[in-house]
Amino acid sequence: TERSRLFAAPSAPDSVAAWLRRYLEALKVRHANPINLAARRSQLARFNAWCVDAGIATPAEVTHAQLERFQRHLYYARKPNGEPYALNGQASVLANLQAFFRWMVRHQHLPSNPAADLDLPRTPSRLLREPLSLTEVEAVLALPDLAEPYGLRDRAILELFYATGIRRQELANLKVADIDTERGCLLVRQGKGRK
């Protein structure tokens, strides 16, 4: 996208883009999850594009008031289909900015963190209020067409989710060798938080 190209373009050593690239490199060196790193890169590229439009050249020029304006920009921004961005996405962008500015202060590149007291949007709880009933579980497990190969695959995926409670990315990372049929166990190589 245009935003990503702008982020990757050559820039002055003290520019927002240059510092964001250094920050992402520091995360990469610390073995950050590649999927999370890609998401952070996209979100920080969005902030960089906003800084370019706002005439903010360096991180030292960023103030708390400007970050509040960026937060309002996120709130009023629309997807290509005209829908607003989800609150969880807005909160994630702002949390990544807080982490970036915290890193800048920790490594003595800035004297203070302009994002320190930024109020993040309240996001609704995503947990189920109550677990699915046995009837509901059976109805979900009966959805795949077991006469089709994709149906068998989908049923196995649903069974794994239900029986183990693993996360979507953990399931996507599973290999056949991670299944111990003798003991009835799964080896989850990389769970949330690198666990």
Where do the language-model regions lie?
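Conserved catalytic core of the tyrosine transesterase superfamily
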Residues: 1-195
